[in-house]
């Protein structure tokens, strides 16, 4: 039997499976006037395609903020799941649209939906939007959310070499030595051969001796005499200073939102800058 739209689909209801509707098309393309006309004529804003994509998913993935606003105002389900489990907030983060992310959050989108795959924070790290990453953390995103494919958001940001996102995560208290199959963010940094990333992770307490499920240290993924290899060699011969180790341990003690706590300490501004990695 051919999938068909539900008879009498009301705004706020999820319809039967259909192919992409005019509402999907208008939402994806950012045709806000056409979308508004469709909504006013009674078109269902929660109709799902065979892969469970709603018009709100389509608009969010393309960063069409005006269309997202129209759909939400018309009763679109803010936490609808597609076939992969992703919500519109995941898609908005994947697009890197801070405006869409703000709209969805204002309508109550869950920042930590129960997922085994990429969370909104993972998607923001994947897209490289440090602004989205910062906003999600501010509203309570789980820094250690685990994706069965990628690991933590920090793993994703390092694998994609998004240094701004990495620093936001680390400053917010992300576990620098979190592991997926014993593989840490430092292993990813070594694999992508990014010296700046390697140095940042080590400065935040990354364990250069951690071994993955193949028994390899991060340095084992570098070429002899290459810049990354020399970087690891330097830190093996020159461990972090006492002041650096104190900073790492104090940051661990402050935990999530550590920067906010450090800024309120009754200590000289120079020390606050040092503890904040400025």
UniProtKB/Swiss-Prot annotation:
Written domain comment of the UniProt record: The SOCS box domain mediates the interaction with the Elongin BC complex, an adapter module in different E3 ubiquitin-protein ligase complexes.
Organism per entry: Homo sapiens
Superkingdom of this protein's organism: Eukaryota
Domain SOCS box: 229-278
Pathway: Protein modification; protein ubiquitination
UniProt-listed GO biological process terms: intracellular signal transduction; protein ubiquitination
Keywords: ANK repeat, Repeat, Ubl conjugation pathway
Function field: May be a substrate-recognition component of a SCF-like ECS (Elongin-Cullin-SOCS-box protein) E3 ubiquitin-protein ligase complex which mediates the ubiquitination and subsequent proteasomal degradation of target proteins.
InterPro entries recorded: Ankyrin-SOCS_box_domain, Ankyrin_rpt, Ankyrin_rpt-contain_sf, ASB13_SOCS, SOCS_box, SOCS_box-like_dom_sf
Keyword Cell cycle among record annotations: no
Record PROSITE patterns: ANK_REP_REGION (PS50297), ANK_REPEAT (PS50088), SOCS (PS50225)
ANK repeat intervals: 18-47, 51-80, 84-113, 116-145, 149-178, 181-210
GO CC, any one term: cytosol
Name of the protein this chain belongs to: Ankyrin repeat and SOCS box protein 13
Higher taxonomy: Eukaryota, Metazoa, Chordata, Craniata, Vertebrata
Keyword Repeat found: yes
Record family assignment: Belongs to the ankyrin SOCS box (ASB) family.
